[in-house]
Amino acid sequence: MDLSKLYQSLNSVLKDKVFYGSNVYDNEDNASMPYIVYQEVTKRPASFSDDTPNYYKVNVQITMVTKKKNRNLEKNLEQVLLNSGFAFSLLSEFKNEDKSLNRVYEITMEEFNNVS
């Protein structure tokens, strides 16, 4: 699993507008739209040897927030993910109270423990 590679890929779509876990620059200012937030949401053992996990499957959620529907930006993000080796699933798309749009993707990565 390489979150730094994922960050670099996402940052190529929206330069300096990619955040881990939240969209907060600091305690006072939030990022202006559009921006991307990504975070690990699950980490489950996928294979065992002698009751010890060999590797984990990690699901990472990627949320792109835009002021309004932006199909070109969506296509760009999806193409960058695919070109970077990240197969994605689109989980949902919904409007926020301020009429902004969240488009939520998920990717699955593997984290190996006992590499021989």
Which residue ranges define each predicted feature?
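Broad gene-expression machinery/nucleic-acid interaction feature
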Residues: M33-Y35, N59-Q61, N102-V104
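Short, compact, well-ordered microdomains
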Residues: R71-V104
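Short, charged interaction patches at domain edges and termini
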Residues: M1-S9, V41-Y55, L91-S116
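Small/polar-rich, solvent-exposed N-terminal microdomains that initiate assembly or binding
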Residues: M1-F48, K69
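Short glycine-rich, basic-tinged beta-strand/loop micro-motifs
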Residues: N54-T66
